Structure formats: structure tokens, C-alpha cells
């Protein structure tokens, strides 16, 4: 039986931290207290104008490859989860492949499930590996959400940051992914979306992120609890056997509400939203890499990753490191 396991993790945050006070100094009608009380966010990172999602992904990927002890040409599958691709086409995954110097014909494609994207990408990669068609995958979440924010809308622009996280997933004799579940319900698309599009060389409609925060909160807490319980049930284990919970880092209130529903202490929740903001598809692999490198997540530990994002999409996976 072929299984899949994480062999290495990596991440990258562009530039210096941008504090809430820095945003106020830039003219945004908000305050440090207002942002912290509602979101738990104290700072975030924003990419410079010349940096793209594939640039962020490249550095995160190089760090994951180094941690796994493999060369770029050892990768035979590249999946990039992003809602802020470098261009309409080719895929950001193909551009990343070129930047990493991978010339072996590895398959490369993007996944667009917004903040659930990394869970989707990891689950897809695991299926490829377990089928025997591929042996080693590079799965990346990379975003430059600062490009799609309306900086006059203080209800959204203060929430997001830019960054990338990556894992190397490889074939193994013992399971590293114990269970997974993916879901979507497109009827909820109006509560979190970028409604605009490009047509005939013009931007048609609204090109900025729009969100109904209260509706998103209620939906997110419900489905994050449900999908975590779903993967636990699939694996035949209880939440008490899980060492860590790594949710999508949307805001601290969603993390706290999800932990309460699952009966998990916040001490077991990997939290980065305070210093990263919401980095969409990058948030889970960023948090995972941080926890691996600081020694919290160690070999043998079990953890749940889970995300919810525009679409609406949601998903979770139970892993053993």
C-alpha cells in the first residue's frame, strides 16, 4: 500500500511587518485598538509592487525542498493554491516550476479554492501519490491579497496579508494523511467574493474583495467544526488524540469559536493571525512551517488542518507528522 507523508515544510513573508499603526499612518480610518479587538491582528506583511505570488512561492518552496533534503528535479508534481495568480495564464505553478529550474516535465497546475486552497491542494496531491502515478509533490499556498483590496474599506483592508507556505509530500509506507474531506456550496458566493472580471482588455465589474463579515463568521464557525469532526470520524479517532489544530487564520474570533466547539484548548491551536493577518491559501502552510521549525510539531504528532473560503469552500485533513 502506498501512502503519503510530509517530508519538509517552508514559508516566506515579504518585507518588514506592517503594524496597525502603520496602516493608520497611511491614512486608513481605523485604530490599533479597533483592529485588535475585532480580529486579533497586530501586523501583517505586504509584498512590494514587483513581487508576485510565484516569487513568494519560490522562496517558500526552496525552504521546503531544503528541509526535505531533495533537489528540485526530484519533484514530479507541483500544485499551487492561489487566488492571486501572476497572470490569467499560464498557471502560477508552471511559472514556479520555471523559477525553480525544474526541467523534468513534472505536472504543474493551480487550485483556486481561496482560503481552503491549501487543504484542497494537499488532498489532491495525496490522491496522485497514493495512485502510484507520482512520487513526490510540491504543494504551495501563495497569495498577494494586497493587490485585490479596497484600501478605502477599513472592514476588509486591515484583515489581509501576503505570504507563501509550502510542503514536500512524498510516497511513504506508513500514512501521513489519515483522513480528509472537501466541500463547497456555491450558493453562498455573494458573502465573500471579488465580483469583477477581465473582458476585452477591460476590468468589468468590481475588482476588489467584498465581504459580509457577520455572515462569513457564522458560516465559517459552523463548517469548520463540522469538517473537523468529519475527518476525526473517518479516521476513527477522537479529538483528544489530536496534538494540534491548525485552522485557516481568518481572525482570532473564528479560531476561538472553532476551538470551543471542538472542545480544544487554545493552547493546542497554532495561531499566527496576530502577526500574519489573513493570508488566504498561504495561512495554513505558513502556520504549519512555523510550528515545525519552533519545535511544537514533532515526529509522531497528529494535527488537523482546516480551512474555509470564498465559494464557499471548506475542507480539513487529519495528518500525522
From Swiss-Prot:
Enzyme class, broadest EC rank: transferase
Main location group: cytoplasm
InterPro entries (UniProt xref): ACP_syn_III_C, ACP_syn_III_N, FabH, Thiolase-like
Catalysed reaction equations from the record: malonyl-[ACP] + acetyl-CoA + H(+) = 3-oxobutanoyl-[ACP] + CO2 + CoA
Keyword Thylakoid: no
CDD domains the UniProt entry points to: KAS_III
The keyword Kinase is assigned to this record: no
GO CC terms, sorted: cytoplasm
Keywords: Acyltransferase, Cytoplasm, Fatty acid biosynthesis, Fatty acid metabolism, Lipid biosynthesis, Lipid metabolism, Multifunctional enzyme, Transferase
Gene Ontology MF terms: 3-oxoacyl-[acyl-carrier-protein] synthase activity; beta-ketoacyl-acyl-carrier-protein synthase III activity
Renumbered residue ranges of the record's region ACP-binding: 249-253
Any Gene Ontology biological process: fatty acid biosynthetic process
Pathways per UniProt: Lipid metabolism; fatty acid biosynthesis
Domain of life per record: Bacteria
Active site, UniProt feature: 115, 248, 278
Subcellular location: Cytoplasm
Summary of subunit composition and partner proteins: Homodimer.
Comment on protein domains: The last Arg residue of the ACP-binding site is essential for the weak association between ACP/AcpP and FabH.
Family: Belongs to the thiolase-like superfamily. FabH family.
Known role: Catalyzes the condensation reaction of fatty acid synthesis by the addition to an acyl acceptor of two carbons from malonyl-ACP. Catalyzes the first condensation reaction which initiates fatty acid synthesis and may therefore play a role in governing the total rate of fatty acid production. Possesses both acetoacetyl-ACP synthase and acetyl transacylase activities. Its substrate specificity determines the biosynthesis of branched-chain and/or straight-chain of fatty acids.
Name used for this protein in its record: Beta-ketoacyl-[acyl-carrier-protein] synthase III
Organism: Aromatoleum aromaticum (strain DSM 19018 / LMG 30748 / EbN1) (Azoarcus sp. (strain EbN1))
Amino acid at each position: 500500500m502506498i501512502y503519503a507523508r510530509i517530508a519538509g515544510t517552508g514559508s516566506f513573508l515579504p518585507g518588514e511587518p506592517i503594524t496597525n499603526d502603520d496602516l493608520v499612518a497611511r491614512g486608513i480610518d481605523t485604530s490599533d485598538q479597533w483592529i485588535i479587538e475585532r480580529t486579533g491582528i497586530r501586523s501583517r506583511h505586504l509584498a512590494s509592487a514587483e513581487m508576485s505570488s510565484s516569487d513568494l512561492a519560490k522562496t517558500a518552496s526552496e525552504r521546503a525542498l531544503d528541509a526535505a533534503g531533495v533537489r528540485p528535479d526530484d519533484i514530479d508534481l507541483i500544485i499551487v493554491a492561489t487566488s492571486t495568480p501572476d497572470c490569467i495564464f499560464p498557471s502560477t505553478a508552471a511559472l514556479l516550476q520555471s523559477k525553480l529550474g525544474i526541467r523534468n516535465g513534472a505536472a504543474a497546475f493551480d487550485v483556486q479554492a481561496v482560503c481552503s486552497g491549501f487543504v484542497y491542494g494537499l488532498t489532491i496531491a495525496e490522491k496522485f501519490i497514493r495512485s502510484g502515478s507520482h512520487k513526490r509533490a510540491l504543494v504551495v499556498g501563495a497569495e498577494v491579497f494586497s493587490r485585490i483590496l479596497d484600501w478605502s474599506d477599513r472592514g476588509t483592508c486591515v484583515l489581509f496579508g501576503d505570504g507563501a507556505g509550502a510542503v514536500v509530500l512524498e510516497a511513504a509506507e506508513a500514512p501521513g494523511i489519515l483522513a480528509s474531506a472537501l466541500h463547497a456550496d456555491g450558493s453562498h458566493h455573494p458573502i465573500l467574493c471579488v465580483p469583477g472580471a477581465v473582458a476585452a482588455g477591460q476590468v468589468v465589474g468590481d475588482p476588489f474583495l467584498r465581504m459580509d463579515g457577520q455572515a462569513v463568521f457564522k458560516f465559517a464557525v459552523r463548517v469548520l467544526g463540522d469538517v473537523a469532526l468529519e475527518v476525526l470520524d473517518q479516521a476513527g479517532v477522537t479529538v483528544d488524540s489530536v496534538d494540534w489544530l491548525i485552522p485557516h487564520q481568518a481572525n482570532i474570533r473564528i479560531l476561538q469559536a472553532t476551538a470551543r466547539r471542538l472542545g480544544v484548548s487554545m493552547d493546542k491551536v497554532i495561531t499566527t493571525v496576530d502577526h500574519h493577518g489573513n493570508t488566504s491559501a498561504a495561512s495554513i502552510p505558513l502556520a504549519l512551517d512555523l510550528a515545525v521549525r519552533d519545535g511544537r510539531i514533532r515526529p509522531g504528532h497528529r494535527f488537523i488542518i482546516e480551512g474555509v473560503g470564498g465559494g464557499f469552500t471548506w475542507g480539513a485533513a487529519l495528518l500525522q507528522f
